[in-house]
Amino acid sequence: MDEKFNERYRFYDSTINPTIEKAFHAVAIDEIRKVFDVTLIRPHSTHIRQQKEQVVQVWFPGGHGCVGGGSQKESGLSDGALLWMMEQVEALGLALDKSYIQHEVHPNCSASFDNTSKWPFNVAGTAPRQFEGDVSNLHESVKNRWTDLNINPPYKPAIPEIQMMLEQELGALRKKEIVSV
């Protein structure tokens, strides 16, 4: 059913145009609503090294609105993605007019968010997103949220592969902090 629901809004082609030298994409780890399934950007190059340089897709904690700029309550999460995007643009030497940003940017990887699916977005059902990449594709805020002992219940990304990666890389640190508290 989600295929039919999304048919009208699906990207025709997710491969970037050859005239695009660099593309950045902030992706929500915790989005579970099928109507907001992720469309990853595909590089136009066939060379692996060039592909990694053309398209940078980084996964952030939170749902679709949390990463893309949802409610004020979740702005700490979206501010993290916004700051990352601004840093990418500035690193390319492009001018960035920050006067268009209507609030101070205060990233907070520990900000709470509601990951439940409500009407009408629950009509198509829920499922974790398909993850492509490795731990290097996770923004630092994911790791910081994972090890933050003040989040109750402890952060558990919606994508099982990411949970396993974090457990392998940071599990000992998380357990060590819990024991020392």
Task: Enumerate the predicted regions with their spans.
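Active-site- or binding-pocket-proximal scaffold segments within functional domains
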Residues: 1-181
